[in-house]
């Protein structure tokens, strides 16, 4: 697991993700034509109360992967 630093609108964020999740997080940002900071900020707004952002990012990536597999 590696800690990554992001920024958006003057705010700094850090997130620790395994290499595979980081790669998929970057792919999500690319697919949505967003910076990593924009994607993090967008996900932060929808993070369930009591959840961590790391968990929310992993869950979002997992749900996206499942949806794509079902659509294929």
Show the residue positions of the predicted features.
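Short acidic, gly/pro-rich beta-turn/loop elements at beta-sheet edges
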Residues: 16, 25, 69
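C-terminal structural segments of small proteins and small subunits
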Residues: 48-72
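Surface-exposed, Lys/Arg-rich phosphate-binding patches that contact polyanionic backbones
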Residues: 20-38, 42-45
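Short Lys/Arg-rich basic patches
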Residues: 1-16
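A generic structural signal for ordered secondary structure
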Residues: 13, 17, 34, 40, ...
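Alpha-helical membrane-protein topology signature
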Residues: 6-9, 27, 56-58
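Generic ordered-secondary-structure signal
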Residues: 8, 20, 45, 51-53
């Amino acid at each position: 697991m590696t800690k990554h630093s992001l920024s958006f609108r003057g705010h700094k964020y850090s997130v620790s993700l395994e290499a595979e999740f980081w790669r998929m997080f970057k792919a999500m940002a690319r697919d949505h034509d967003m910076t990593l900071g924009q994607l993090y900020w967008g996900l932060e707004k929808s993070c369930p109360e009591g959840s961590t952002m790391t968990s929310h990012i992993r869950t979002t990536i997992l749900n996206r992967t499942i949806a794509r597999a079902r659509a294929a």
